[in-house]
Amino acid sequence: MTNCEKDEEFVCISCVEEVRYSFVSHLSEALRRKGINNVVVGVDSDDLLFKESQAKIEKAGVSVMVLPGNCDPSDVWLDKFAKVLECQRNNKDQAVVPVLYGDSLLRDQWLSELDFKGLSRIHQSRKECSDSILVEEIVRDVYETHFYVGRIGIYSKLLEIENMVNKQPIGIRCVGIWGMPGIGKTTLAKAVFDQMSSAFDASCFIEDYDKSIHEKGLYCLLEEQLLPGNDATIMKLSSLRDRLNSKRVLVVLDDVRNALVGESFLEGFDWLGPGSLIIITSRDKQVFCLCGINQIYEVQGLNEKEARQLFLLSASIKEDMGEQNLQELSVRVINYANGNPLAINVYGRELKGKKKLSEMETAFLKLKRRPPFKIVDAFKSTYDTLSDNEKNIFLDIACFFQGENVNYVIQLLEGCGFFPHVEIDVLVDKCLVTISENRVWLHKLTQDIGREIINGETVQIERRRRLWEPWSIKYLLEYNEHKANGEPKTTFKRAQGSEEIEGLFLDTSNLRFDLQPSAFKNMLNLRLLKIYCSNPEVHPVINFPTGSLHSLPNELRLLHWENYPLKSLPQNFDPRHLVEINMPYSQLQKLWGGTKNLEMLRTIRLCHSHHLVDIDDLLKAENLEVIDLQGCTRLQNFPAAGRLLRLRDVNLSGCIKIKSVLEIPPNIEKLHLQGTGILALPVSTVKPNHRELVNFLTEIPGLSEASKLERLTSLLESNSSCQDLGKLICLELKDCSCLQSLPNMANLDLNVLDLSGCSSLNSIQGFPRFLKQLYLGGTAIREVPQLPQSLEILNAHGSCLRSLPNMANLEFLKVLDLSGCSELETIQGFPRNLKELYFAGTTLREVPQLPLSLEVLNAHGSDSEKLPMHYKFNNFFDLSQQVVNDFFLKTLTYVKHIPRGYTQELINKAPTFSFSAPSHTNQNATFDLQPGSSVMTRLNHSWRNTLVGFGMLVEVAFPEDYCDATDFGISCVCRWSNKEGRSCRIERNFHCWAPGKVVPKVRKDHTFVFSDVNMRPSTGEGNDPDIWAGLVVFEFFPINQQTKCLNDRFTVTRCGVRVINVATGNTSLENISLVLSLDPVEVSGYEVLRVSYDDLQEMDKVLFLYIASLFNDEDVDFVAPLIAGIDLDVSSGLKVLADVSLISVSSNGEIVMHSLQRQMGKEILHGQSMLLSDCESSMTENLSDVPKKEKKHRESKVKKVVSIPAIDEGDLWTWRKYGQKDILGSRFPRGYYRCAYKFTHGCKATKQVQRSETDSNMLAITYLSEHNHPRPTKRKALADSTRSTSSSICSAITTSASSRVFQNKDEPNKPHLPSSSTPPGNAAVLFKMTDMEEFQDNMEVDNDVVDTRTLALFPEFQHQPEEEYPWSTFFDY
């Protein structure tokens, strides 16, 4: 990993030797789990802190100082800490986190002597909280105050990358991370690397890949990164391949800019081992294409909440600062950066330290005008890779075409001699330009940097290639002749532009000046000229005082001049290169005198030029496509345009003096004639390829020939023309307020009939037989004739309908909109395939049974309160609370379309259901919603084979000013771990209102209910879903129509999940217990198991720990009698553990645990031992204070001490070993046993066993107390039976246990107590380990200290009353 250990990601922990391997080791490990891997621990030994670690402390981003509690005020440690504090004050980027560990009476004294000014927090150990809580507090402080800045917004992106990786087939998987400069590609790649690298055999993170491979070469780079520590240099790439073809390798190539360089590395990456992962980050999409990477993740910017967090942290602004202006400034900065983390961080740091708001305002304005070098350098490095044409197109877009229609931009740039189709794609691939909703967009930073490139070319305004700043342009164009004190005119010479200028866009909103006649004389290469007013409320005042314009550049492609003040363009202007003339509201009477060459002209817009009288000059524009003369009230004639074969759009609306049109081009698509004096069109007007006529005509003969005519709008009288409609497909008579009736149209082939807004229309004789869409909104029709069976959409919104015919036979009807039909009284029935029903604002009191196919119901303002059960409801805004509650409960309690016995195929086809209602209407309903935007649920084991899907309840808080919820939706992410421990996920998007429908203003918070049978984990063996421990996590995110996450103004406040399974009785929907709410966290296999363990009863926890450490892979019949001997219920306990996936029992009766389950058991044991270790010192002190009399009383319990040979069979009593320790001064450890009938009979007998110092073949046994029960006569039989159950296993166990039980790893040759002192069958099994060496590492104890880890394994010993056990015997030496 090259150059990865940045100073700002480096943590130094300084401590004393006493806490290095206890508290500090836990702290460093917790930091690593949080993703902070660069942690260095320095120990104060021989002044090492300042001799060797001082440089590291000064370079570290965070310095954690762990001060011991027993510090004396004169201690050198305090002097060192004071110096570290001073170092921190000199280095503002470094954070110091002091930790006062341990109790001390002197603490208050020396605390007062230290100056903690500037430190955000001091952490102290307290009696009332454990070390684990203290560690958690420190880690949170370190992460949130220093490291969190770089990881804001990373979590959700990590999930998407993980999902992208998991979807790829097993083999060599590749992912590309793509995004604009500063968007967080490297940060995201590092986060992925930190999270995944431990799962690979080899891994490397190569920063600045192009530079690294140029400096070191391919072989050296590969050898250094993938095989560190090699002595021999790899001379051939084939040798490297041979060494890595069996390894799972993670390779991250960061910031690959040269596609060929990346391809040279990856073209043969098939030599990596299966399961390898290659991640490439680049700002150029072509890199991924050439490298053969198809899975590309585009990094999005931070959302509003994340951006605010980052800015406040970077600028050190507190969240609760009350000054409104300061908050407004932060919003402006965040909006300007538009989610770019680099910009937000840089601007935040630039504003940091500014005390006055005015200073911050000024600094921000300067930054906008001149972006910081770090940002400019990041963007300009991409700009420098462009070709000359690509640079010109980028600069044109940055200066002039932000947000313009992409086809419009392409048309203009093509006229300039570029190849924009290809070159704009290059800009998109390099993240300089984006295309959204068919418009060209640049990030605000990109636009400003592009403009800065232009301004940086020269300080002379007249020599800049592109001009857009109004005051600079005014300086060049303003008329400069003035009278001085009534004297003759004096001329003030000014620069008047130069041939370098290629584009000039002047916004005249705030300007008032006179243009000089020769303003454009020197701009010989001007391609783009636009003079406009961005504020429609301002009337610009820019005139020619001399009444003339001498010239315009002949290289113009765009001439856009609003309110042009002259009667014509200069006569010497040659428009042969013009692509567009756009001169609305001009004073033009004609364009020019005579005929000009207009071979490049595509568009001419002279709308509202009230003085225009003649446009005959356009006949030479053979490539003309659009003519817009709307509002030219003096224009009397439209020329014959039959030769303009490319003309497709003509707008003559408002040209009241035009009485006729002689000829219409054959390829016309749109003809707008509203407000003209035209009463009729010639027969030649209507052609077979006409697609739309928009007019106010009274007669259109020859329509029968219009086989492709689709639309005819605003026809005033239909009687005379219906017979000529021929093969008309769509007839629009919208807003024909004079139309009163329509004849029988049964013989027409109409598919669409739109009568919306025909307020006088009160009768229809008959409908076309193939009609599919009928719009009657706003009509006066009270009754309609029989509807055609082909009908798919009926919209009668706001009509006067009182009744409808029976629609049960309309099997194709999908949408029925009766909203606002205030006079509608009854509905006889609904079609069986109806999907959307709207009757908001009706007076219906009762609605017939709704079909099962229904998906959307809008009942806003409806008086109906008797709606039947169905699947998808929306917009219950004003129904009563009781009705809404009934709907919630019905939806969550009955799913009648999934009856018992349904096949999986039919279940997969089952429809979804959903509905919503204002949250205030269901306040009294019981839905078990949890706070937060995510929830973890557990599947009952009995439900898993019948699982169909989930019902999800989500409560969303909308902002008060939210007006239109049409595009609002909710994304649900379902995550679980499969039985192999791998993370899995499913994501579904639910849009809460049907697209295209008008949604009332959302005024209240809403509760949404969704169900989808596809939200179901994959099936494992049989029909059992492949879910580990039955735990599933659901997360909910507000989204828009484009499935992009909305900002934090939309908040998921509560959520819940219910299970839907195949019906087992009268209902098929069961409640499920909500385990916990998390917001949000990543659920690993370990966390799933730990939640299952924490929910167990105490005895089941003990059973799990026994099995995890002793009985893995053993037969149930073998384990059962042994566990029963310690008073545990084996049969029920094993079933409980199996139900929550903590163990599994194989078909041949073996208890099986996965490695993760065993690991968790060991960690739990280790954690309990750490907790107990805190009690040892206090226990020792307490025992040392025990009165001698009490100690003698305990010693008097010793009944006898005997010596027997080590090979002796024993005393035939049943004993259980519960501890062992090394004894100072002795070669042999001592074992501690208690009677096996302690719990069943209350027996207090114990014994201690140790080898003799003089004869190692003899055992010294000390018996304490007596048994209170007869000697068991069946013990040997029981042991024999257990041995016969698995004789081979038992013999192997006995051999292992006899020589290795609790062997101290520091003394491998030291003989230990044999297990024969305990009954062979029981003892052998009791101390059999799956991995004895690993267990010994976790269970080792210091000399003369109780083996508390063993005590943790047997918790019943921890709670034994004091009089039942001679504690003093542990401290005899």
Curated annotation (Swiss-Prot):
Task: Report the Pfam families cross-referenced here.
Answer: LRR_3 (PF07725), NB-ARC (PF00931), WHD_ROQ1 (PF23282), WRKY (PF03106)
Query: Which GO BP terms apply?
Result: defense response; signal transduction
This chain belongs to the protein called Disease resistance protein RRS1
Q: Which GO terms describe its cellular component?
A: nucleus
Q: Which residues bind DNA?
A: 1204-1272
Q: Where are the LRR repeats?
A: 498-522, 535-553, 554-575, 577-598, 621-646, 665-688, 742-766, 768-793, 831-854
Q: Where is this motif: Nuclear localization signal?
A: 988-1005
* UniProt xrefs under SMART domains: WRKY
Q: Which organism is it from?
A: Arabidopsis thaliana (Mouse-ear cress)
All copies of the NB-ARC domain together span 170-421
Q: After gene disruption, what is the outcome?
A: Loss of resistance to C.higginsianum.
The entry's localization annotation reads:
Nucleus
State the residue spans of region: Disordered: 1300-1323
Q: Per UniProt, where does ATP bind?
A: 179-186
Assembly behavior: Interacts with PopP2, a R.solanacearum type III effector.
Main role? Answer: Transcription factor. Interacts specifically with the W box (5'-(T)TGAC[CT]-3'), a frequently occurring elicitor-responsive cis-acting element. Also acts as a disease resistance protein involved in resistance to fungal and bacterial pathogens, including R.solanacearum, P.syringae pv. tomato and C.higginsianum. In presence of RPS4, elicites an EDS1-dependent hypersensitive response.
Q: Which residues form the TIR domain?
A: 5-146
Print the miscellaneous field.
Ecotypes susceptible to C.higginsianum or R.solanacearum, such as cv. Columbia, contain a protein with a premature stop codon while the longer allele found in cv. Nd-1, cv. Wassilewskija or cv. RLD confers resistance.
Keywords in alphabetical order, please. Answer: ATP-binding, DNA-binding, Leucine-rich repeat, Nucleotide-binding, Nucleus, Plant defense, Repeat, Transcription, Transcription regulation
MF-aspect GO terms: ADP binding; ATP binding; DNA-binding transcription factor activity; sequence-specific DNA binding
